[in-house]
């Protein structure tokens, strides 16, 4: 503990004032899902306006707060990232940048299934809580311990609705643990409600639904898309920056280095570690018509989701280390590797037809997953595949039982080591 450096100590003087004279470089990382990356609005299109992304607005604020510090920022937002995948990504996509300050946003993607009973939702929240604590413990183990700010971005829903209750439950479970570590939190949902109350004073007939429609797209079903209009993103920006501006000491400071974990009896998950195997790593052997695409050899696709030599759309922006793709007329393909991991995960896979994959360890079936076929091709259901103890040979077999030719893609294998 004596040898650790706490980045949060560098933000203020001994008198408690913002240290505007410090010239120390400042590294800031933002970790979250699509609302952090700013990749899409409600229509699924790219947010091209730099000012719309809340991390960029925060960065602009920090540059004003610390005018003498050279600030570098990395946006590690990636669509669909919640606490589980965030824990897997933390070392590779956050700690690799030696951050002094980290902003985390998972509350939307961590929202439990609204169709489950509340008791089941509680179990889901507890499960995600363990991975968020894993992230905090990873940060604690750094020689330079970063400051952390947690941001609750909202799910637009009517108060008391199933969707609203599920989201608030997710936030409540996080708040309990974040208080244990004395990590500051910013709740944008509260800001939205305050804005609604202010508007209602001017127009007593205004309903919450009509108010939300000014910021979000509402479908015919009455459900709002979680990706807002441009004005919704601006509301995020104002909420986060105003909180930081009002009480910087509340957020820009070290968190408590707790010896005991919060999630009692869950040491296996809270203290686990992760390793990424890139799809182009020599450890992985392929069977089938596979190709590896990198930043220099980009995967370009058309709307048919099949790879073409030239085109307008690129799908590997999220995979700077490469994408492996196999063209499958109707037969099977596979990739295999040796590992001593306790489990493996394939967090981002895609196929146009929703192909099924079966995982074997030393010839015995240990799990399977189905690839979703949305535009980013993400798979988060049944992520972790438990493996036998010790060294084993893992084979992933992809099946195409249809008569239609298609492709399968993936970016990484994540090795999971329990402690």
Q: How would you label these PLM feature ranges?
A:
Residues 2-76, 91-98, 343-348, 352, ...:
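Serine-esterase "nucleophile elbow" of acetyl-processing enzymes
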Residues 2-7, 209-419:
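Conserved catalytic region of serine esterases and O-acyltransferases that act on ester linkages
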Residues 27-31, 72-77, 101-106, 147-152, ...:
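Structural recognition of the beta-strand scaffold that forms the well-ordered cores
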Residues 29-30, 37-44, 83-126:
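Oxyanion-hole/transition-state-stabilizing segment in secreted/luminal serine hydrolases
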Residues 109, 136-172:
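Active-site segments of SGNH/GDSL-like serine hydrolases
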């Amino acid at each position: 503990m004596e040898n650790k450096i706490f980045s949060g100590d560098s933000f203020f003087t001994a008198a408690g004032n913002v240290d505007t004279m410090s010239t120390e470089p400042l590294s800031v990382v933002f970790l979250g899902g699509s609302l952090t990356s700013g990749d899409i609005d409600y229509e699924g299109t790219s947010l091209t306006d730099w000012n719309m992304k809340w991390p960029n607005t925060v960065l602009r604020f920090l540059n004003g707060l610390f005018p003498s510090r050279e600030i570098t920022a990395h946006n590690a937002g990636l669509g669909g990232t919640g606490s589980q995948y965030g824990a897997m990504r933390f070392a590779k996509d956050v700690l690799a940048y030696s951050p002094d300050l980290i902003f985390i946003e998972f509350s939307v993607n961590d929202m439990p299934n609204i169709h489950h009973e509340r008791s089941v939702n509680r179990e889901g929240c507890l499960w995600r809580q363990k991975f968020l604590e894993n992230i905090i413990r990873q940060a604690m183990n750094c020689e330079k311990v970063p400051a952390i700010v947690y941001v609750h971005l909202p799910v637009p829903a009517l108060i008391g609705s199933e969707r609203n209750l599920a989201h608030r439950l997710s936030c409540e479970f996080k708040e309990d643990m974040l208080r244990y570590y004395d990590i500051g939190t910013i709740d944008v949902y509260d800001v939205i409600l305050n804005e609604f109350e202010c508007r209602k004073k001017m127009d007593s007939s205004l309903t919450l639904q009509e108010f939300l429609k000014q910021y979000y797209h509402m479908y015919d079903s009455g459900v709002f898309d979680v990706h807002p209009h441009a004005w919704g993103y601006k509301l995020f920006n104002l909420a986060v920056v105003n909180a930081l501006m009002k009480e910087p000491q509340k957020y820009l400071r070290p968190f408590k280095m707790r010896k005991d974990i919060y999630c009692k009896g869950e040491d296996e998950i809270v203290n686990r570690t992760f390793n990424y195997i890139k799809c182009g790593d020599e450890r992985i052997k392929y069977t089938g018509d596979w190709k590896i695409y990198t930043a220099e050899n980009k995967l370009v696709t058309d709307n048919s989701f099949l790879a073409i030599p030239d085109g307008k759309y690129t799908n590997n922006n999220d995979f700077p280390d490469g994408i492996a793709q196999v063209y499958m007329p109707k037969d099977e393909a596979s990739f295999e590797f040796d590992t001593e991991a306790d489990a493996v995960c394939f967090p981002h896979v895609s196929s146009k037809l929703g192909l099924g994959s079966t995982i074997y360890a030393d010839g015995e079936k240990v799990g399977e997953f189905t690839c979703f076929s949305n535009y980013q091709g993400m798979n988060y259901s049944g992520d972790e595949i438990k493996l036998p103890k010790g060294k084993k040979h893992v084979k992933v077999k992809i099946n195409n039982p249809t008569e239609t030719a298609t492709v399968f893609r993936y970016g990484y294998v994540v090795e999971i080591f329990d402690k």
